[in-house]
């Protein structure tokens, strides 16, 4: 990163700490990650603002606070193998890949997946597996997973994702239509407990693939 970007990323991490993010590893990952890399050049000047921004195809790069909060919730379970549903710009994947030994990420929009792969390669992150496909189905051949993060809002919690969690594994997912709740779902054998974390707003999790 340039000196200006490095300072901006550090300031963003500080603002997230002030907003309540406590995990120092998460804050360090935010400080280390050039968010402008995941945006069109025209939006580069907004890269370190704590706001969601458009990335094309009706999708967004999530607000940094939400990226950090969801990551913090996931890391409480010390996962070694993580599944991300909705690669999008690749920014959330960049944060996760710095904090877990193995990341698998699924994206249904081919053009976004191609761009994300190129960006993450530039960051020299090599512990990521990519899949172009329907996020509702997860990635059964790669599972089970210690943790799953969904970066789009589902109308209901997808059964396929629950089935791909290990025992004591955690699913972090926004659920709802116009009114959405961020849920933390934990597997206990064949049972699941669910906790509402906070109110959020995400683009919808859509079935199928889009070239």
From Swiss-Prot:
Catalytic activity entry: [protein]-L-isoaspartate + S-adenosyl-L-methionine = [protein]-L-isoaspartate alpha-methyl ester + S-adenosyl-L-homocysteine
GO biological process, one term: protein modification process
Entry's Gene Ontology cellular component terms: cytoplasm
Gene Ontology molecular function: any one: protein-L-isoaspartate (D-aspartate) O-methyltransferase activity
PROSITE patterns cross-referenced by the UniProt entry: PCMT (PS01279)
One Pfam entry name: PCMT
Keyword Cell division part of the UniProt annotation: no
CDD domains reported for this sequence: AdoMet_MTases
Domain of life: Bacteria
InterPro entries per the UniProt record, alphabetical: PCMT, SAM-dependent_MTases_sf
Protein's job: Catalyzes the methyl esterification of L-isoaspartyl residues in peptides and proteins that result from spontaneous decomposition of normal L-aspartyl and L-asparaginyl residues. It plays a role in the repair and/or degradation of damaged proteins.
Protein's recorded name: Protein-L-isoaspartate O-methyltransferase
């Amino acid at each position: 990163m340039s000196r200006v970007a490095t300072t901006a990323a550090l300031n963003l991490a500080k603002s997230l700490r002030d907003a309540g993010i406590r995990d120092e590893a998460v804050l360090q990952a935010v400080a280390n990650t050039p968010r402008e890399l995941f945006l069109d050049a025209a939006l580069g000047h907004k890269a370190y603002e704590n706001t969601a921004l458009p990335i094309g195809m009706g999708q967004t790069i999530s607000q940094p606070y939400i990226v950090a909060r969801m990551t913090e919730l996931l890391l409480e379970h010390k996962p070694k193998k993580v599944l991300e549903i909705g690669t999008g710009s690749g920014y959330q994947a960049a944060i996760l890949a710095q904090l877990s030994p193995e990341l698998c990420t699924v994206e249904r929009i081919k053009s976004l997946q191609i761009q994300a792969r190129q960006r993450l390669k530039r960051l020299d992150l090599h512990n990521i597996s990519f899949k172009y496909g329907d996020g509702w189905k997860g990635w059964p051949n790669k599972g089970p997973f210690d943790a799953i993060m969904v970066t789009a809002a589902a109308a209901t919690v997808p059964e396929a994702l629950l089935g791909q969690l290990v025992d004591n594994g955690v699913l972090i997912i926004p659920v709802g239509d116009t009114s959405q709740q961020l849920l933390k779902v934990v597997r206990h054998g064949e049972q699941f407990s669910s906790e509402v974390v906070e109110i959020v707003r995400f683009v919808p999790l859509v079935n199928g693939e889009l070239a």
